[in-house]
Amino acid sequence: MTSLESVSPNLAALSQTVSESKTPLPLLKAALADFRAHQHTAFDNGTSVAELITARAAFIDHILALCWQRFNWDENLSSLRKSRISLVAVGGYGRGELLPNSDIDLLILIERANAQHHSSNIQSFLALLW
């Protein structure tokens, strides 16, 4: 496995449908189930564990980016630096090593002065992931 598309060939279609959907959760759950099945098949066919855990982290990166992009994080549309909030992967996932039953550890880093500005989006984002 060398690319994310080879791991999950429907990512472009998933990106489009998730961005347009009012209810993305069923689409995301189906994509995760398809990805798990694909990984089981790849493992059975001899794909190295190192490749599988790296591909899993890359796939989750893509899913999280789709979820994150559903929200408007911009605070200052006239500035070059529009937002002062970041989603950061930490732990094994942050190292690009995501085992099948590992937690997905995330940190939302935000400038203290802007914390209230994003509270509703953060709550909705976390609810979507939960």
Regions from the language model: what does each represent?
Residues S86-S119, L129:
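Catalytic metal-binding acidic patch
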Residues I122-F125:
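Amphipathic alpha-helical segments in well-structured domains
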Residues S79, A127-L128:
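A general structural signal for short secondary-structure junctions and capping/turn motifs
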Residues M1-E75, S79-S83, N101:
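N-terminal regions immediately upstream of nucleotidyltransferase
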